[in-house]
């Protein structure tokens, strides 16, 4: 059975986890408030509390046998909390990695359309932080980046 670890079981992360679980995946993931997931998670899911300044307990065990790691967690104060706390723990990860970013990385183009190949040129601090986080995820884990519009 394949295992997915999802940092941030919120709107996007939870939907993704539910879809993977229906296909037979084992789910591990984090949330700031585990009680909010009551009734929304499957049997056998491993849910861990995660806040931006507290590393997960026993990360070696938590990341063992994980095939996929995905982060939906925002960059905070210009930095990525997942890689800040667990970058070293994930150095030897050889599975697939994904980072859910936002379209705020694109320039402000009110009279035009941005495409996936539009060069990043964020107009906001949040967008600038996302660009840095994307780069870190790509450089360290070879992550694929998904830029969600309108929800981040």
Question: Regions from the language model: what does each represent?
Answer:
Residues 29-35, 51-52:
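N-terminal Rossmann-fold cofactor-binding loop
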């Amino acid at each position: 059975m394949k295992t997915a670890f999802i940092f941030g079981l919120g709107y996007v992360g939870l939907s993704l986890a539910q879809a993977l679980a229906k296909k037979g995946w084992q789910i591990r993931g984090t949330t700031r408030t585990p009680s909010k997931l009551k009734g929304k998670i499957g049997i056998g899911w491993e849910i861990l509390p995660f806040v931006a300044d507290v590393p997960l307990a026993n990360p070696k065990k938590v990341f063992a046998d994980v095939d996929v790691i995905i982060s939906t967690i925002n960059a905070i104060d210009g930095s990525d909390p997942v890689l800040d706390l667990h970058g070293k723990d994930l150095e030897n990860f050889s599975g697939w990695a994904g980072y859910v970013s936002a379209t705020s990385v694109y320039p402000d183009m009110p009279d035009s359309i941005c495409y996936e190949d539009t060069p990043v040129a964020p107009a906001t601090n949040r967008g600038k932080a996302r660009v840095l986080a994307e780069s870190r995820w790509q450089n360290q884990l070879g992550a694929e980046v998904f830029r969600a519009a309108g929800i981040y």
